Amino acid sequence: MNKPKTKTCLVILSILLMCSGQVLAQQQGREKYEFTRNLPVYADSLIADLTYPLAWGHSDIRDFDAWKRAAREKVFDCMFTPPPAPANGFEAKVLYEEQREGYKARKLEIRLSRYYTVPAYLLIPDGKGPFPAVNVLHDHGAHLFIGKEKVIRPLACEDSVVIKDAEAWVQNYEGQYFGDYLARNGFVVFSTDAPMWGERGQKEGPRRDRYDMIAGNMMMYGIDLSAYMTYDDIRATDYLASLPEVDSKRIGCTGWSMGAYRTWMLSALSDRIKAGAAVCWMVTTDEQLTLHYSRTENGGFANCLPGLRRWLDYPHIASIACPKPMLFINGSKDKLFPVAGEQNAFAIMHDVWESQGAGDNLETELWDMPHSCPLRAQERVLAFFQRFL
């Protein structure tokens, strides 16, 4: 038998079976159902039962510092067991270095856990430090092939496929690498791959449809993939603070989309962070998980911390960062986040900052833009950090 022809026939047969299965599934719809558009039909009843009893103003804790400790403890509790700390520190290795215009770029490998090492990019301005620093947190975008390379221009040591992919993705930032922009303006910049992105992805390739399956399997170990992302961001910031080129009292974080989610989570949970700027990720669960809108960002496993919603909503978690300076920019044309949810979240946070006499430290802005991180947003973030770091 001709083996190449046999292999081709098997591939064709597999495709036909897959397609027929999809068609059959579409034809097998039942008259009665309980789920639609990835949500239960009783979604609004679930939302009505959410009272967020640990939120500031809902909780019976009246001392703000005591509330922050209790709220932070609850978040960590819902994040499950953290990855075990490395036994011998970060064991950082410089894999490659190149000089850029006004700053050096390094590729590193650092140990964030006894389980694993993590690749990272580090940009250091020329001149005498120490400098203020920013942990730039990459986005999701349903694009897992690259991570840190979305926000820092890939070094020359990277494969040409990675470089080409990053050059295409940076158009979401209007062609400017966010991290390089900050480095040119005097900031040390650091960025790592989140779990499942870039060099922390799957051997079989960056298949988005496998993300949820892997996240579910992680839960079977009693751990949480989204939580690991946040735990890593906290430890990566600890590493950043340890560098001699960095002024450890002037560290901020920023990101777009999932990077924005990572930003306010990190700002809330790490005392290392002195200021945070989040672009296009803030909403309330009431508007995020309802069937009232044709399309919303349900989040999925990328921001799933089991049980936490029974205690705190997104803006309540972000408010643990109070009274730190925080900037939130959302888009009025962002199809992922309903405007009502953005505005309600902003109002909740303003109430918290105002209650602590720190109203001037919280800046929330709703721009006439879609889900994007344009040059003017990056300029706004730079001005914010120049003011507060």
Protein language model regions, located:
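Cap/lid segment of the alpha/beta-hydrolase catalytic domain
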Residues: 129, 136-231, 241-242, 287-290
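Short beta-strand/loop motif that positions the catalytic acidic residue
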Residues: 321, 328-330
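C-terminal catalytic histidine-bearing segment of alpha/beta-hydrolase fold enzymes
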Residues: 301, 347-389
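Bacterial Sec-dependent N-terminal signal peptides
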Residues: 1-31
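Alpha/beta-hydrolase fold nucleophile elbow
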Residues: 245-257
